Amino acid sequence: MKNTSSSTTLTMNDTIAAIATPSGKGAISIIKISGHNALNILKQLTKKQDFTPRYAYVRDIFSDGVLLDKALVIYFKAPYSFTGEDVCEIQCHGSPLLAQNILQACLNLGARLAKAGEFSKKAFLNHKMDLSEIEASVQLILCEDESVLNALARQLKGELKIFIEEARSDLLKLLASSEVLIDYSEEDIPSDFLKEVSFNLEKQIASFKDLLDFSNAQKQKNKGHALSIVGKPNAGKSSLLNAMLLEERALVSDIKGTTRDTIEEVIELKGHKVRLIDTAGIRESADKIERLGIEKSLKSLENCDIILGVFDLSKPLEKEDFTIIDALNRAKKPCIVVLNKNDLAPKLELEILKSHLKIPYSILETNTLNSKACLKDLGQKISAFFPKLDTQNKLLLTSLAQKTALENAITELQNAKNHLETLELFSYHLLSAIENLNSLTRPYETSQMLDSMFSEFCLGK
């Protein structure tokens, strides 16, 4: 689409326009316009002059005198809008072609095509939202975890900002007190002051660590727990994977070495995302490709969170089984020992198997011919390894920049506490901690850094 804006300079003073709804057909599409010329563009599109702010109107939409659609239009007068500027929304029928034509009409009338995240950038620069609220709005769009929605909604409401600002205010009071006492000799500094400051710093550090720990745990949950399924060929790994997926995802065959590479699928278990990794059967092989698959299987044990070690209960322990046991011991990960094929006569020496395992483990017997009966037990054993997160009334850090800033603030507060006897150093580290807190909600980034941050947003946002 050609942008016919008379100015090629991309400035925050431009009137911008974009389609705010996802691509594809739907009931409606929304075109947003923001800037000093937004209302004038809407008047020309509708051939109407009277628009009361925050009232919805059904209006015909024209382009060069040609009727395009009958749409719902709303005018938000500055500063009472998302961006803080005049904003107009056009809600048309959900044809992608129609939305593109209306957008082009906006561009023909002087708007510029918005860059990704530019509406949010305007809101940020016009002090309609702080950085923590902007981050929350993006994560809310991307969120796939119901337990996180409440924390994001609270952050969007501004509760993280309030938490940070209250902490910042308390630290500023400590800084002011320490600056007053710098000119005093050490023996003139009240001992009660040092004790109170130390107590307050410990309390602040603990609250920051709680926020950081919860955010890190939630990030791991969002990423998903990696669960590797390992065993010798024909132990029943692929059958177990298929049963857990309730579909034929992995090829099940009596021919050894059928699975030559890792197969990865994602399921949800007890509210947690789990990445199931079916690995190549571990055995000695002259086949170069199969050996590469086996090496990849052993490597997956180093990077996973939980291991399902699958053993054939109907056969005595073999050299390949002991190779797997050694791999489990080296990985030092939580392990569920799955004794498969319990519908056949047991020949596996269970006590020998137990004596060779040097890691925490639990045991589950399964029958791949009727494995659904034990899937519930398997799910409970797997979920027992998941951390129990209390998401009620919790705040959440949603970006690496936020986590880094808080980690730096914690480090500086600890440094300040360690230098309580030297108030100049104490004040220096305390000020550094405050500056790191500032970057969570009121960053001092350059224009280029802001452009980079907001470019990650979607168009129309």
From Swiss-Prot:
<dbReference type="InterPro" id="IPR004520">
    <property type="entry name" value="GTPase_MnmE"/>
</dbReference>
<dbReference type="InterPro" id="IPR018948">
    <property type="entry name" value="GTP-bd_TrmE_N"/>
</dbReference>
<feature type="binding site">
    <location>
        <position position="128"/>
    </location>
    <ligand>
        <name>(6S)-5-formyl-5,6,7,8-tetrahydrofolate</name>
    </ligand>
</feature>
<dbReference type="GO" id="GO:0030488">
    <property type="term" value="P:tRNA methylation"/>
</dbReference>
<keyword id="KW-0378">Hydrolase</keyword>
<feature type="binding site">
    <location>
        <position position="89"/>
    </location>
    <ligand>
        <name>(6S)-5-formyl-5,6,7,8-tetrahydrofolate</name>
    </ligand>
</feature>
<dbReference type="InterPro" id="IPR027266">
    <property type="entry name" value="TrmE/GcvT_dom1"/>
</dbReference>
<dbReference type="GO" id="GO:0005829">
    <property type="term" value="C:cytosol"/>
</dbReference>
<dbReference type="Pfam" id="PF01926">
    <property type="entry name" value="MMR_HSR1"/>
</dbReference>
<dbReference type="InterPro" id="IPR027417">
    <property type="entry name" value="P-loop_NTPase"/>
</dbReference>
<dbReference type="InterPro" id="IPR025867">
    <property type="entry name" value="MnmE_helical"/>
</dbReference>
<comment type="subunit">
    <text>Homodimer. Heterotetramer of two MnmE and two MnmG subunits.</text>
</comment>
<comment type="function">
    <text>Exhibits a very high intrinsic GTPase hydrolysis rate. Involved in the addition of a carboxymethylaminomethyl (cmnm) group at the wobble position (U34) of certain tRNAs, forming tRNA-cmnm(5)s(2)U34.</text>
</comment>
<dbReference type="Pfam" id="PF12631">
    <property type="entry name" value="MnmE_helical"/>
</dbReference>
<keyword id="KW-0630">Potassium</keyword>
<dbReference type="Pfam" id="PF10396">
    <property type="entry name" value="TrmE_N"/>
</dbReference>
<feature type="binding site">
    <location>
        <position position="253"/>
    </location>
    <ligand>
        <name>K(+)</name>
    </ligand>
</feature>
<feature type="binding site">
    <location>
        <begin position="234"/>
        <end position="239"/>
    </location>
    <ligand>
        <name>GTP</name>
    </ligand>
</feature>
<dbReference type="GO" id="GO:0002098">
    <property type="term" value="P:tRNA wobble uridine modification"/>
</dbReference>
<keyword id="KW-0819">tRNA processing</keyword>
<feature type="binding site">
    <location>
        <begin position="278"/>
        <end position="281"/>
    </location>
    <ligand>
        <name>GTP</name>
    </ligand>
</feature>
<dbReference type="GO" id="GO:0003924">
    <property type="term" value="F:GTPase activity"/>
</dbReference>
<feature type="binding site">
    <location>
        <position position="32"/>
    </location>
    <ligand>
        <name>(6S)-5-formyl-5,6,7,8-tetrahydrofolate</name>
    </ligand>
</feature>
<keyword id="KW-0963">Cytoplasm</keyword>
<feature type="binding site">
    <location>
        <position position="461"/>
    </location>
    <ligand>
        <name>(6S)-5-formyl-5,6,7,8-tetrahydrofolate</name>
    </ligand>
</feature>
<dbReference type="InterPro" id="IPR027368">
    <property type="entry name" value="MnmE_dom2"/>
</dbReference>
<feature type="binding site">
    <location>
        <position position="258"/>
    </location>
    <ligand>
        <name>K(+)</name>
    </ligand>
</feature>
<dbReference type="GO" id="GO:0046872">
    <property type="term" value="F:metal ion binding"/>
</dbReference>
<feature type="binding site">
    <location>
        <position position="238"/>
    </location>
    <ligand>
        <name>Mg(2+)</name>
    </ligand>
</feature>
<feature type="binding site">
    <location>
        <position position="259"/>
    </location>
    <ligand>
        <name>Mg(2+)</name>
    </ligand>
</feature>
<dbReference type="GO" id="GO:0005525">
    <property type="term" value="F:GTP binding"/>
</dbReference>
<feature type="binding site">
    <location>
        <position position="234"/>
    </location>
    <ligand>
        <name>K(+)</name>
    </ligand>
</feature>
<protein>
    <recommendedName>
        <fullName>tRNA modification GTPase MnmE</fullName>
        <ecNumber>3.6.-.-</ecNumber>
    </recommendedName>
</protein>
<dbReference type="InterPro" id="IPR031168">
    <property type="entry name" value="G_TrmE"/>
</dbReference>
<keyword id="KW-0460">Magnesium</keyword>
<keyword id="KW-0479">Metal-binding</keyword>
<feature type="binding site">
    <location>
        <begin position="253"/>
        <end position="259"/>
    </location>
    <ligand>
        <name>GTP</name>
    </ligand>
</feature>
<comment type="similarity">
    <text>Belongs to the TRAFAC class TrmE-Era-EngA-EngB-Septin-like GTPase superfamily. TrmE GTPase family.</text>
</comment>
<feature type="domain" description="TrmE-type G">
    <location>
        <begin position="224"/>
        <end position="387"/>
    </location>
</feature>
<dbReference type="InterPro" id="IPR006073">
    <property type="entry name" value="GTP-bd"/>
</dbReference>
<dbReference type="InterPro" id="IPR005225">
    <property type="entry name" value="Small_GTP-bd"/>
</dbReference>
<keyword id="KW-0342">GTP-binding</keyword>
